[in-house]
Amino acid sequence: IALYVRTHILETPEFRKAEADGETSKKTLPIVTVCKNYPLNIALGIGARWIDGVFFNVLAVFSITYLVQQLHTSRTEALTAVMFAALLMCPFILLAGRLADRFGRGRIYGLASLACGISVFPSFWLMQNSGGSMFLIGLAIAIPLSIFYAGVFGPEAALFSDLFPARVRYTGISIVYQFPGFLVAGIVPGLCTVLIQWNEGDPFYICIFVLIAAATSAFSAFTIQARHNRAAKAAGAIQD
């Protein structure tokens, strides 16, 4: 699928113009240009990316450990609930992308980030009070992960592309996406274990942590949208 997409979709007009102007062949290393000229863009991108890594690792990774160790659910049932949520998420990713094209990438991403941060509270509450019901456990994971997280994941790549000009876009997006990715992936599950031990098995501290990440990402996404709109207005073609 990736090969088909890559060979059938043309480069953007912006990139083709940069290539024709010789900007893509300049000798300055793109990573030097990005770090020197776009530090705020990098910070905003990393801030926006935070909820992606945090929320996924809490709901799709740590929740399995929580269900098995704290609620004594079988590992098979916990994995089944997460796999069901991941499968259900696919059409909602497409819907989120469509909504982002219509209403603005930053708006949809920011609202979805806030929804993720808020939904984690009832999600863990429902897991705690499920009584071992697979239906309730599946519901507790599927709604936040399949619907709200899809609103983050769907417009994410397009949102980050708004941060950098064509000549350094690939490098800029790589920094924004990969740097917080490997940090969060390694830290969040262990941090959640520590937080839940501190609170004697209660996931409230974890929910607060997710909410802080969500607020940070929402602020960053709304700021990216506002900056993009100002730049588009200055160019005479605002894109809401």
PLM features per residue range, with description:
Residues 2-7, 159, 211-240:
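Multi-pass alpha-helical transporter architecture, strongest
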Residues 7-30, 233-237:
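Flexible cytoplasmic inter-helical loops of multi-pass small-molecule transporters
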Residues 39-86, 184-189:
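Extracytoplasmic gate region of multi-pass secondary transporters
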Residues 93-105:
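Helix-to-loop junctions at the C-terminal end of transmembrane segments
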Residues 102-114:
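Cytoplasmic membrane-interface "Motif A"-like loop-to-helix N-cap segments
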Residues 114-131:
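C-terminal ends and interior cores of transmembrane alpha-helices
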Residues 167-197:
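A late C-terminal transmembrane helix in Major Facilitator Superfamily
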Residues 194-212:
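A membrane-interface helix-boundary motif in multi-pass transporters
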